Design a protein with these regions (language model features):
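Short, structured segments at the rim of ligand-binding sites
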Residues: 1-221
């Protein structure tokens, strides 16, 4: 907007002041990459023990996720506009607590919980942003995950290869992503229903995962 001639002060602060102008002029602007989609793809690479590079992202925007993945034992390389996660045979459980940016994103909490189901040891996930943000827990448990949910806290007892295929139902956008990620490592064929939730935040996620080698397809019912 400023590039178009708007009079705006306070960008990056808690108070923004806007002074009206007669008209705005055309301008070219690059949209900020979706850090949540980028983070989901990084977790997909990690949970499957893969080697994945996400390009055209802003590593600074995912610093909290990168730090937690490194704490868990993953090797993460960052470039100017890319992040690479390297495979590891085992990783350890780490605790996360969601917080406003630059803290750990609530919109990656469910996906990270799926990752922690495969970790060595116990993880504690604390949700500070939204109520009722653990609706995916019941479906992960249906797949075999060992998770104890409480009001704002969920305790995840991880163990590799502990998930088995089952029909599961997406309850919201990020929950659907976590179930897809869990399905990638569950033994057998996992069916995730109500994936219209997924489409609200991801563009052809199944095609991107298939391009990385996942055995996944969208089925019309």
């Amino acid at each position: 907007l400023i590039a178009m001639g708007a009079q705006i002060e306070g960008a990056g602060t808690s108070v923004i002041t806007v002074e009206g102008v007669e008209e705005l002029s055309p301008a070219t602007h690059s949209i900020v990459p979706d850090r949540i989609e980028a983070g989901t793809l990084l977790i997909a690479g990690a949970i499957t023990g893969g080697h994945v590079t996400v390009e055209h992202c802003v590593p600074e925007h995912l610093q909290s996720l990168v730090e937690k993945m490194r704490d868990a034992g993953f090797r993460i390389d960052t470039g100017d506009d890319s992040i690479t996660v390297h495979a590891t045979e085992t990783w350890r459980g780490v605790d996360i607590a969601t917080a406003p940016y630059p803290g750990f994103p609530t919109d990656l909490q469910a996906q990270f919980m799926a990752l922690m189901t495969q970790a060595r040891g116990t993880s504690v996930v604390t949700e500070h942003i939204f109520e009722n943000r653990f609706m995916h827990v019941q479906e992960l448990v249906r797949l075999g995950a060992d998770i104890t949910p409480m009001t704002q806290v969920a305790v995840v007892r991880g163990r590799r290869n502990n998930l088995d295929a089952a029909p599961v139902m997406a309850t919201d956008l990020r929950a659907s992503a976590s179930l897809v990620l869990a399905g990638l490592v569950a033994g057998g064929e996992t069916e995730v229903s109500r994936i219209y939730h997924l489409d609200r935040g991801y563009e052809h996620l199944e095609e991107k995962l298939a391009g990385l080698g996942a055995d996944i397809e969208r089925v019309a019912v």
